[in-house]
């Protein structure tokens, strides 16, 4: 399976689609978490407690953003590699047929 995956552009693109779905899920959950934290923050928290909560949420949001960027990087790499593999495969077939 793993060796076929590395030489199957369709499987690579399918996997890229899965990474996109994962990235979207992480983004959606981070958005929900941020909205929930905003509701808590507006519910009577003030001063140092509110600032600490906001700082923590900002750090967590950045961590989720990093995860999304990493997932998108893998997705983009898989699509790029699938395209390169197909181009090389076509070039090889042309050379062999001439």
UniProtKB/Swiss-Prot annotation:
Main localization, broad class: secreted
GO cellular component, one term: extracellular region
The keyword Cell membrane appears for this protein: no
Gene3D superfamilies to which the protein is assigned, alphabetical: ESAT-6-like
InterPro entries: ESAT-6-like_sf, T7SS_ESAT-6-like
Subcellular location: Secreted
Secreted found in the keyword field: yes
Family listed: Belongs to the WXG100 family. CFP-10 subfamily.
Protein name, as recorded: ESAT-6-like protein EsxM
Species for this entry: Mycobacterium bovis (strain ATCC BAA-935 / AF2122/97)
